Amino acid sequence: MTLEATSEESRLEDDASQTDRSAAPAAQSAALQHALSVLRRLSEAVKRQVLGRDDVIELVIIALVADGHVLLEDFPGSGKTTLAKALGEAIVTSNEDDVDGSLGAIVPFRRIQFTPDLLPSDVTGGSVFDANANHFHFRHGPIFAHVVLADEINRTSPKVQSAMLEAMGEKQVTVDNATYHLDKLFFVIATQNPLDLVGTYPLPTPQLDRFLFKITMQHIERDAELDVLDSYKSRRDPVAADKLQVARTEVLKARETIDQEVVISTAIKTALVDISRNLRADERVLQGNSTRSMVLMLPALQVLATLRGRSFVSAEDIETLLPRVLGHRVELAPGVAELSRVLKDCMREPMEQLARATLR
């Protein structure tokens, strides 16, 4: 074989490799396409009730399907309750779901208004004495729901916050030395008002780390705000809302399908680890992100890839979600104003290496 032939063969191999990296997304399986349809129906159900918040709705649904939780920083009247309620009521439970009767106390949506005088039992529930039967029985608290809105979570005591921490991390609550399990779909949307810090208890780092995303909500666009005023009556119509609902089992099945079928290559994991290590070593960073944050991010990347019509995680998914995942986890040194600049610098080399890798 001549040198010219060898060179030409190498060039063709390089071209083929480059074509493979830039090719159209691999076709999704029938099961993955069904999972995508479940996510789209769920998204559409929420969008009919919450206008002008498409980006926030997408992140919230990603967190739900990825088995994470969301922290919203917002102002009063921004639609957080409507969003959480719409999501909870879009998920329905049939009698077939409740084979063992364990879902009897689970409701679609609960709102917990956190105050300084709130007790852990006000959240988790507690033992109540039944005089007729002469024994105690457990009264389920508002935390037993598919979707829980923890409103102004930073206004309650650390003791109540720790009760929430157990529920969010372990999907269970402990009352009087007895453990009660929450639903597999248990999902928390917590809020805090960044403008009013009087009488608050800042969330400790371990609890902040339990939230997959921290989302800062802004005022919606002018046209969307007009749509809200024009359609507020129709959006309250329960008949219209019933047409767009998703079964609880469908959401859980979609979660399982996405976990099994969306590929996360070694190159993606390597990039995440290298970015994290760059952040921890950067002199502008006082505290980097934990390994757990990367573990929590993996299923979120899979869900986003599914929403984008792919069966594998790409560099684009990392660029989209990483700022959302790290925004509340990375502590900058005094005088460093922008995390985005630090993150961009720390991502540059790992993402350049990722661009040369095969992802599926």
Named regions from a protein language model:
Residues 59-62, 129-149:
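Conserved alpha-helical scaffold flanking the Walker A/P-loop in AAA+ ATPase domains
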Residues 70, 148, 186:
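Conserved beta-strand position immediately N-terminal to the Walker
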Residues 32-75:
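Pre-Walker A (pre-P-loop) alpha-helix and adjacent loop at the N terminus of AAA/AAA+ ATPase modules
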Residues 64-115:
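Walker A/P-loop
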Residues 74, 151-152, 163:
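Walker B catalytic acidic pair
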Residues 3-5, 12, 21-26, 81-85, ...:
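C-terminal engagement/docking regions of AAA+ P-loop ATPases
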Residues 95, 130-133, 155-163, 168-246, ...:
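Canonical AAA+ ATPase core
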Residues 25-36, 49-50, 200, 214-289, ...:
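Conserved C-terminal "switch" segment of AAA+ ATPases
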